[in-house]
Amino acid sequence: MTKVDFWPTLKDAYEPLYPQQLEILRQQVVSEGGPTATIQSRFNYAWGLIKSTDVNDERLGVKILTDIYKEAESRRRECLYYLTIGCYKLGEYSMAKRYVDTLFEHERNNKQVGALKSMVEDKIQKETLKGVVVAGGVLAGAVAVASFFLRNKRR
């Protein structure tokens, strides 16, 4: 895998391109034959899509990166990083974790990968905590309703 000294941060993924910029990337892919366009053109377009605020664009970006991952072994490292970001933005945290864990196995000393891994794990932890709180609230509500009915039944 080729080494890259700098990748965008998760924050960069939330700074969308202007529609005209995204259209230029799309036209480049179309002019090169769509699915048979160069890997670099498709990669650039996928990243532009992931940066979008439209969830359908983000999903298409993840799909394109998944295709590139499968066909270009030399780009797998980059794809894993960007797939992690794309899945994170889509709220697919378990997939983001799978991608970042795979990347981290090969990039243990890469600070950006480590930071991204920490962000994904923190988000999963927060989402799990929210789930526990919601479940606890539902349980408390069910107990309150049940006790209300039981009290009224005794009267």
From Swiss-Prot:
UniProt membrane topology term: Single-pass membrane protein
Keywords assigned: Apoptosis, Membrane, Mitochondrion, Mitochondrion outer membrane, Transmembrane, Transmembrane helix
GO molecular function: lipid binding; molecular adaptor activity
Record's GO cellular component terms: mitochondrial outer membrane; mitochondrion; peroxisomal membrane; peroxisome
Segments crossing the lipid bilayer: 132-149
Residues in the Cytoplasmic compartment per record: 1-131
Mitochondrial intermembrane side: 150-155
Chief location of this protein within or outside the cell: mitochondrion
Classification via Gene3D superfamilies: Tetratricopeptide repeat domain
Disulfide bonds: none
Record-linked CDD domains: Fis1 (cd12212)
Function: Has a role in mitochondrial fission. Has a role in outer membrane fission but not matrix separation. Required for targeting MDV1 to the mitochondria. Regulates the assembly of DNM1 into punctate structures, in the mitochondrial tubules, promoting mitochondrial membrane constriction and/or division.
Subunit composition and interactions: Interacts with DNM1 and MDV1.
Note: Present with 2410 molecules/cell in log phase SD medium.
Family: Belongs to the FIS1 family.
Domain notes: The C-terminus is required for mitochondrial localization, while the N-terminus is necessary for mitochondrial fission.
Name under which the protein is recorded: Mitochondrial fission 1 protein
Recorded name of the encoding gene: FIS1
